[in-house]
Design a protein with these regions (language model features):
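Polybasic, lysine-rich low-complexity intrinsically disordered segments
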Residues: 1-3
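Nucleotide-state-sensitive switch-loop elements of NTP-binding domains
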Residues: 16-26, 32-66, 74, 83-169, ...
């Protein structure tokens, strides 16, 4: 029987220190590990994630949170890339949490919205994190709100959440952001 290696996480104190005050490379690596920890379903990881969030909370709450939603193909990724590049040009630090549909085989993201933001993704400073929706309704992933806190604690002053392509009734992102934009196709009704 083949065993799957267990994911070993650094201590929550190390992650917190790197997220809040580490070098740019250490910060990005710690953010990725922290969000992976948040998304994990293992009980011990859930405890670590709760502890980490407790340490990060004093460093959150100063970012503009922007939710972008719309039907598949409306141009959410294109809009976010243009907005992100503009904001970076204005001196802002931008994080993008892109929620993608989940693979029924692996459970991971299948569309890779990050690949559609080719100009933004090659910039040195923005942080772009694709996350699978894992069947969560409302266009966001189960731990999107917590992932936003990680981005805020890392000093990103604009956090953009791109929902999985949704209809008008799936607006969970509106309850976790300061501003919500619903992009629509021309001549599509409503």
């Amino acid at each position: 029987k083949k065993t799957v290696p267990r994911m070993v996480m650094p201590s929550t104190q190390t992650l917190r220190d790197d997220i809040v005050g580490g070098s740019a490379m250490a910060k990005r690596r710690a953010m990725a590990k922290a969000i992976t920890l948040l998304e994990s379903t293992r009980a011990d990881h859930r405890l670590q994630a709760d502890e980490l969030l407790t340490h990060l909370l004093p460093h959150t709450g100063l970012s503009l949170r922007l939710g972008i939603s719309g039907v598949p193909g409306v141009g959410k990724s294109t809009f976010i890339e243009a907005l992100g590049l503009y904001l970076i040009g204005q001196g802002h630090r931008v994080a993008v949490l892109a929620v993608d549909p989940s693979s029924t085989v692996s459970g991971g993201s299948i569309l890779g919205d990050k690949t559609r933001m080719e100009h933004l993704s090659v910039q040195a400073d923005p942080y772009i994190r694709p996350s699978p929706s894992s069947g969560t309704l409302g266009g966001v992933a189960e731990k999107t709100r917590e992932s936003m806190l990680v981005c805020e604690a890392a000093g990103y002053d604009v956090v953009i959440v791109e929902t999985v392509g949704v209809g008008q009734s799936e607006t969970a992102v509106a309850n976790m952001t300061d501003m919500f934009c619903l992009l629509q196709l021309p001549n599509a009704g409503d």
